[in-house]
Structures are given as C-alpha cells and as structure tokens.
Amino acid sequence: MSDSLPLLLRAARGESVERPPVWMMRQAGRYMKIYRDLRDKYPSFRERSENPDLSYEISMQPFHAFKPDGVILFSDILTPLPGMGIDFDIIESKGPQIGDPIRSMAQVDALRPLNPSESMPFVGEVLGRLRQSVGNEAAVLGFVGAPWTLAAYVVEGKSSKNYAVIKAMVFREPEILHKLLDHFAESIANYLRYQIDSGAQVVQMFDSWAGQLSPADYDTFAAPYQKKVVDLVKKTHPDTPFILYISGSAGVIERMANTGVDIVSLDWTVDMAEALARLPEHIGVQGNVDPGLLFGTPEAIEARIDDCVRKARGRKHILNLGHGILPGTPEENGEAFFRAGKSVMDRLGAVV
C-alpha cells in the first residue's frame, strides 16, 4: 500500500497527495543554534560531514526540531573529490579551496574512477541510519553536484564571482573540459547509485553554477553531462525520483526538463505559474520561496507559501525554498516555514 510510503516520495512519484511535502535546502546548518554549538566543538567542516556520527546527528537536527517531510544527508557536493584524487578543504568564511586546481589534460588523465563504497563508506552508513531512524515519517534524500559545477570548483580552485578561469577553458581548451566533465558524469552517477543502494529514496543534483552559462554553452557543457548522469542512474534505478536544481535557472527551465529528470527545482527569480507554463505536464516542480522571506514575519511567510502552492496546484509539487536557507535566518522563522507549509491546505482547502 503506497500510503505507507513517505509523503515526499509519493508526491515525487506523481501520486495524488493530501498536501505538498515540504523540506528546505540547507535545512541542517548555521541558522540552527544546535548546529552552531556542534560546529564550535568540531570546527572542521570535513570532519562534521565525513564522521558518520556527526553527519548523522546534524542530518537529524532539523527532523527533531521541525519534522520536515524530507531528511537530506549532511554532506557537501565536493565530498567525492578525494576519491578521484582531488584534495579539498572548506574554510569557514572562505568556502571551498582546491589544493591543486585542474588546468591540464595530464591532470584530467590522472584522475581515478570513483569507488564510493571504498572512498566514502561514511555516506552509506549515514544514509542507512537515516532510513532506519525516520521510517516512513520522512523521505531520505541523497544529493550530488553536477559535472559542470564540480568542474567550476576544481578548475577555478575556489568559489568565483565571474568564473574567468573555467570560461577561458570553455573557449580555449574545450577538449580538456569535456574530458573532465565526462569523468565527473561517470563518477557522479556511480555515487548516486551508491547513495540509493544505501538508503536514499529521492536524489537531487545541484548544478549551482550552470546559471552562469549562456543557453548555447549550457547546451554544450552542462546539459549533456546532466543527462548522462540521469541516464546512467535511471538505467539501474528507474523508480528513484530525480530532482535537478540550478541557481539562476530562469533562462534554461525548458532545457532542464529535457535532461530526463522527474522534477525541476526552481529558484525564486521565476514566477511559479509562469515556470509551470514552460514545463511539460509530466515534469514536477520544487520550490520556490525566496529564502530572504525568512527574515520577514510569520504572516508574510504564510502568505507567500499560500501563493506558491496555489499556483502549483494540479501539478507535482514539493514545497521548498528557491535556494538554501541563509545563515543568520531566525530559527523561529525556519519553524514558521515548516508550520505554514504543513498547514497550507487548511487555508487553501481541497486535495493537491
């Protein structure tokens, strides 16, 4: 009986549900005091995300506090890099730092195929524990970074405002970039399969920086590798719902739907009704409340959620923010978001 399955999983599969499921990107993180206290005790991000006890505890913090409909693995999109031979660290206030940025074909040729069970057994352990702990009260989500976004980090060596280094590679040495992207696509597909086999019920691919590409370059350097990941995962796990998120995606929404994903996660810069008009009926949506709204009042949060859900009615919809919750967000407003999301049908009425 599918009613015994988690609400988010049923909604992501396109079943008729009593309300849109709700979770938040970065729902485990700095806006929560309990997380900040743990961070003070364990200042290394890599330790927090790679020690299975800490990763599990952090993943569960928002579940204990707010009971979201999805519990996402606490990790990072860069976590698989060392398994391919790329070292990195995440420095507080500076973000990711790549020890030896990839700029040559020789460096790409030297990369190892990713074997997640060997290089990241902690991920499998945490996902299994999450499934056991939340049962059918929430769906367990796994996630990865998409090939283009991983390439942007490893070529630039760090976060970037203008992506000049990787853009230079796009236009001067595209053959190096294509080989790197292909390696990442194969590895990321393996990583997602491992996550699903370990307990992830729904998966999301973040192509955070693909919004920096023109549509033509998106078609060349992002979409084919997104599609390769999706195809490889769907070949072995056809029933696992697949979400794709891009920050700044308003110009490529239709292209996102062509990658084979089940759900397009929208940022807040596009109107929900207008986005749905641009997407085929079978494609679901996730989002797309402005995370900045969570600095407002509970009444404003409720009104905006109502508007978002009203516009998405009749379509497969997962309520979320249009980006990760921002550091400094009042924790009580995170709670208000979940409360308003769970009670939305009391205000709007009828079945989704």
Curated annotation (Swiss-Prot):
PROSITE patterns from the UniProt entry: UROD_1, UROD_2
Gene Ontology CC annotations of this record: cytoplasm
MF terms in GO: uroporphyrinogen decarboxylase activity
Compartments, as annotated in UniProt: Cytoplasm
Keywords annotated in UniProt: Cytoplasm, Decarboxylase, Lyase, Porphyrin biosynthesis
Main location: cytoplasm
Site (Transition state stabilizer): D76
GO biological process: protoporphyrinogen IX biosynthetic process
E.C. designation(s): 4.1.1.37
Cited Gene3D superfamilies: 3.20.20.210
Residues reported in the UniProt entry to bind substrate: R26, Q27, A28, G29, R30, D76, Y153, S208, H323
Catalytic activity as recorded in UniProt: uroporphyrinogen III + 4 H(+) = coproporphyrinogen III + 4 CO2
InterPro entries in the record: UROD/MetE-like_sf, Uroporphyrinogen_deCO2ase_HemE, Uroporphyrinogen_deCOase
CDD domains with a match to the protein in the record: URO-D
Pathway connected to this protein: Porphyrin-containing compound metabolism; protoporphyrin-IX biosynthesis; coproporphyrinogen-III from 5-aminolevulinate: step 4/4
Record family assignment: Belongs to the uroporphyrinogen decarboxylase family.
Cited HAMAP family: URO_D (MF_00218)
The protein's role, per its UniProt record: Catalyzes the decarboxylation of four acetate groups of uroporphyrinogen-III to yield coproporphyrinogen-III.
Subunit structure and binding partners: Homodimer.
Record-linked NCBIfam families: hemE (TIGR01464)
Protein name per Swiss-Prot or TrEMBL: Uroporphyrinogen decarboxylase
Organism: Synechococcus sp. (strain CC9605)
